[in-house]
């Protein structure tokens, strides 16, 4: 049985690229859904269980930090990985302090590095 991933990002190109990054059928992971912001992600999670959330930080309506806080307030134990183009140390620290399990820079993403982060 594969682990279910929810991708939260407001950029359609990122969602398409994420799907095409690797042959997901050859991994223990399935991209089961996407959301365009934190609020959409919370609505998705009300109806669909997932094992891992990968989220961007900067989004309208509810950003990634807001999503992390909302999940932690609901005592969620779903691991959250931040996938962002921002390398600012303060943003990284804020995400990890809020409860993110990991932080990946979009510029550094490859199929191998993503799978390595997911395997942690």
Where are these regions (language model features)?
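Structural signature of beta-strand start/N-cap positions in the alpha/beta core
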Residues: 4, 31, 49-51, 79
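Conserved acidic segment of CheY-like receiver
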Residues: 3-14, 18-19, 53
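Two-component/phosphorelay signaling modules centered on CheY-like receiver
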Residues: 12-33
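CheY-like receiver
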Residues: 43, 51-120
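Conserved SAM-binding loop
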Residues: 7, 34, 82-84
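Short hydrophobic/Thr-rich beta-strand motif most characteristic of the beta2 strand and flanking loop
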Residues: 26-36, 44, 92
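Acidic, metal-coordinating helix/loop segments flanking the phosphotransfer/catalytic sites
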Residues: 19, 34-52
């Amino acid at each position: 049985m594969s682990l279910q991933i929810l991708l939260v990002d407001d950029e359609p190109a990122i969602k398409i690229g994420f799907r095409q990054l690797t042959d997901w059928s050859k991994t223990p992971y399935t991209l089961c859904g996407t959301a365009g912001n934190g609020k959409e992600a919370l609505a998705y999670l009300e109806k669909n269980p997932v094992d891992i959330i990968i989220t961007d930080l900067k989004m309208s309506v509810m950003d990634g930090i807001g999503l992390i806080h909302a999940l932690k307030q609901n005592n969620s134990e779903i691991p959250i990985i931040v996938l962002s183009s921002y390398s600012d140390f303060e943003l990284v620290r804020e995400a990890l302090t809020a409860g993110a399990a990991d932080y990946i820079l979009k510029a550094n993403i490859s199929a191998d590095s993503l799978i390595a982060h997911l395997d942690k």
